[in-house]
């Protein structure tokens, strides 16, 4: 390693980094970028975001005394270079793997990971809390939050900045802007002006003038507005927004000019009050395929970096593909069907729909709360909104789900992707709770397809209904079953897959094939329940009468899930039967492959069989 990475091989912590001369930092950044590409191409993971913040990461750890100074990364996709520089370089081959290092900053993993993350737009709120605590204790530590131009569009980020501006707390927010959406004013002049506005002379004059003008409020307000206007003209019109929130805006500066980054950050480290640094970067920087197609190279499987070709592994369509195709099929005949996504177009299978039906497609950015209530408004106006959202992100709009959809009994369809175990992204991304938090909401109909054909029929059934509906389906490839013509399902009715004896397995969702292997092997009854709400109560009652053991199977937390619903009903009708609930345990599910998680928690055929045998013994 020393031959290929002579500088990086010496860096076991930021303390080692800070021993380097400034003249070595560019060479280190080049080595870090190459190492990141070599590492991720062998393991899979998030690539383009990390490539874009290499210089910024080096500069931050060079200027700030981490971990004494607190560095917080929003979301965490871009934190791979941070992990490499903070003692985890030689563990990068384990990232996103079972018992390996976490794909996002994780507090239990390193003192350099101040905040555990995975969802977006949380950094400034947490950073403000950390900064306030440091100020109360006179700790002298600095707080820095790095947030992307996607994450900063979320309401939570602006709520935090509004509060920070009011408190006038010492903290730095860095906007990592890797799009052209905010500003294009990047260049030598802007870098020079950023150094002036962050420098000690300008800052001293600014702060001294404020103290004098505090006694003359009218003139002080005029000067403040003049400064905001000047920055808006020189830097970016967007600077006015952040200045109005109470931040001192600097930028935009070139996020790949490490010399300018170090100079500007060194100046800003000494500034008081809320500071905002706008840094322009290029996602995928330094690797041409990722620069040209940052979306495809955002998260990558293992690939050959020399060719830059990503493997085409999909023979069977994914459940997301099935959803996207259904949406296009429906939109061909109904201009009132509307597709909504909170910044997950590619992941939710909506690319084709967005291109073919642009007037019926809305990407509301990272704004799950808004997405749900926006759908409510469309439904009130007579449209048929379909909200495509990951299970883990629907959690962020729970009040809107209840207050704006369910109470008004509006016909909004929720296509809940990544329900159940998602694999390598770990605790923050598992779809473990949606059945539990939706099942208690009145007016909701909840469906769990066992395969893509059933999913197809359920989506159509939801389309025909005039009440809120949710269809939850897993990450990954479907089963390869041919789709039948669309037809409505009988709401709340299950279907018996195999009629057996003694044991009845009530399956909710896509684990049906695992359950079927066990049922056929032992001649157990197997039921595809289809609906979590309403349950097929008649069938459950009959099965309780005719079988000595009932088993529920679901890819959701056992607490409050589908099995709990069956148990509650049996208690209600006084049929106290032996009942085995198989699902996800009371813990946050760590990273691994989906198959490893199924085996670990007894959700594969072997585990199901063992749990039933234990109950029968």
From Swiss-Prot:
Protein name as catalogued: 1-deoxy-D-xylulose-5-phosphate synthase
Q: What does this protein do?
A: Catalyzes the acyloin condensation reaction between C atoms 2 and 3 of pyruvate and glyceraldehyde 3-phosphate to yield 1-deoxy-D-xylulose-5-phosphate (DXP).
- Enzyme Commission number: 2.2.1.7
Cofactor(s) needed, names only, are: Mg(2+); thiamine diphosphate
Q: How does it assemble?
A: Homodimer.
Picking any one GO biological process from the record gives: isopentenyl diphosphate biosynthetic process, methylerythritol 4-phosphate pathway
Q: Which GO terms describe its cellular component?
A: cytosol
- Pathway terms, separated by semicolons: Metabolic intermediate biosynthesis; 1-deoxy-D-xylulose 5-phosphate biosynthesis; 1-deoxy-D-xylulose 5-phosphate from D-glyceraldehyde 3-phosphate and pyruvate: step 1/1
Residues reported in the UniProt entry to bind thiamine diphosphate = 77, 118-120, 150-151, 178, 287, 368
Concerning HAMAP family, the annotation shows: DXP_synth (MF_00315)
Q: Which UniProt keywords apply?
A: Isoprene biosynthesis, Magnesium, Metal-binding, Thiamine biosynthesis, Thiamine pyrophosphate, Transferase
Tell me what organism the protein belongs to: Haemophilus ducreyi (strain 35000HP / ATCC 700724)
Q: Which SUPFAM superfamilies match?
A: Thiamin diphosphate-binding fold (THDP-binding), TK C-terminal domain-like
This entry's comment on the bound cofactor is: Binds 1 Mg(2+) ion per subunit. Binds 1 thiamine pyrophosphate per subunit.
Pfam families recorded: DXP_synthase_N, Transket_pyr, Transketolase_C
Report if keyword Transferase is assigned: yes
Q: Which InterPro entries match?
A: Dxylulose-5-P_synthase, THDP-binding, Transketo_C/PFOR_II, Transketolase-like_Pyr-bd, Transketolase_BS, Transketolase_C, Transketolase_CS
Q: Where does Mg(2+) bind?
A: 149, 178
Kindly list the GO molecular function terms attached to this UniProt entry.
1-deoxy-D-xylulose-5-phosphate synthase activity; magnesium ion binding; thiamine pyrophosphate binding
- Kindly give the Gene3D superfamilies that the UniProt entry links to this protein: 3.40.50.920, 3.40.50.970
- Family, similarity comment: Belongs to the transketolase family. DXPS subfamily.
Q: Which residues form a coiled coil?
A: none
Reaction(s) catalysed by this chain, per the record, are: D-glyceraldehyde 3-phosphate + pyruvate + H(+) = 1-deoxy-D-xylulose 5-phosphate + CO2
């Amino acid at each position: 390693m020393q031959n290929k990475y002579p500088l990086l091989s010496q860096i076991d912590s930021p303390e080692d980094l800070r021993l380097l001369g400034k003249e070595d930092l560019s060479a280190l950044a080049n080595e870090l970028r190459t190492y990141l590409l070599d590492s991720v191409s062998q393991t899979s993971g998030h690539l383009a975001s990390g490539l874009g913040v290499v210089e910024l990461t080096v500069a931050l750890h060079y200027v700030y005394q981490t971990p004494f100074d607190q560095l917080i990364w929003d979301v965490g996709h871009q934190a791979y270079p941070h992990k490499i520089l903070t003692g985890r370089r030689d563990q990068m081959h384990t990232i996103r793997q079972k018992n390996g290092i976490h794909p996002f900053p994780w507090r239990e993993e390193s003192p350099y990971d101040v905040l555990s993350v995975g969802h977006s737009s949380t950094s400034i709120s947490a950073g403000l809390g950390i900064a306030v605590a440091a100020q109360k204790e006179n700790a002298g530590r600095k707080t820095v939050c790095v947030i992307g131009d996607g994450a900063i569009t979320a309401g939570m980020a602006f709520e935090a900045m509004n509060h920070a501006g009011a408190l006038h707390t010492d903290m730095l927010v860095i906007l990592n802007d890797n799009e052209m959406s905010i500003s294009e004013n990047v260049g030598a002049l802007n870098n020079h002006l950023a150094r002036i506005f962050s420098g000690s002379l300008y800052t001293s004059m600014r702060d001294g003038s404020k103290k004098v003008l505090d006694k003359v409020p009218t003139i002080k307000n005029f000067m403040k507005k003049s400064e905001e206007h000047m920055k808006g003209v020189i830097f970016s019109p967007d600077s006015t927004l952040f200045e109005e929130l109470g931040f001192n805006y600097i930028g935009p500066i070139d996020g790949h000019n490490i010399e300018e980054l170090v100079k500007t950050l060194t100046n800003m480290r000494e500034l008081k009050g809320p500071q905002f640094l706008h840094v322009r970067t290029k996602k995928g920087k330094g690797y041409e395929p990722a620069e040209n197609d940052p979306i495809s190279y955002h998260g990558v499987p293992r690939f050959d970096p020399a060719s830059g070709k990503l493997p085409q592994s999909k023979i069977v369509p994914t459940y997301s593909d099935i959803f996207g195709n259904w949406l296009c099929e429906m939109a061909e005949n109904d201009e009132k069907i509307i597709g909504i996504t909170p910044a997950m177009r590619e992941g939710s299978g909506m690319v084709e729909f967005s291109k073919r039906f642009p007037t019926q497609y809305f990407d509301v950015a990272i704004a799950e709360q808004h997405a749900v209530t926006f759908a409510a408004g469309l439904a009130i106006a007579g449209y048929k909104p379909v909200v495509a959202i990951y299970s883990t992100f629907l959690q962020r709009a729970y009040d809107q789900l209840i207050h704006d959809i369910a109470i008004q009994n509006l016909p909004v369809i929720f296509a809940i992707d990544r329900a159940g175990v998602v694999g390598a992204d770990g605790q923050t991304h598992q779809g473990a709770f949606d059945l539990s938090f939706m099942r208690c909401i009145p007016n909701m109909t909840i469906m769990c397809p066992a395969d893509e054909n059933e999913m197809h029929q359920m989506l159509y059934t939801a389309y025909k209904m005039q009440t809120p509906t949710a269809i939850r389906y897993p990450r990954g490839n479907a089963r390869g079953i041919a789709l039948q013509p669309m037809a409505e399902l009988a709401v709340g009715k299950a279907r018996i897959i195999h009629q057996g004896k003694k044991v009845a397995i009530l399956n909710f969702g896509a684990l049906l094939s695992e359950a079927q292997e066990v049922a056929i092997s032992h001649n157990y009854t197997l039921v595809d329940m289809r609906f979590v709400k309403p349950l097929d109560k008649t069938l459950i009652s009959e099965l309780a009468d005719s079988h000595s053991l009932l088993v529920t199977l679901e890819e959701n937390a056992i607490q409050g899930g589908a099995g709990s619903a069956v148990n509650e009903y049996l208690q209600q009708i006084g049929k106290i039967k032996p009942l085995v609930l198989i699902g996800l345990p009371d813990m946050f599910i760590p990273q691994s492959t989906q198959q490893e998680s199924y085996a670990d928690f007894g959700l594969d055929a072997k585990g199901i069989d063992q749990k039933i045998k234990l109950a029968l013994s």
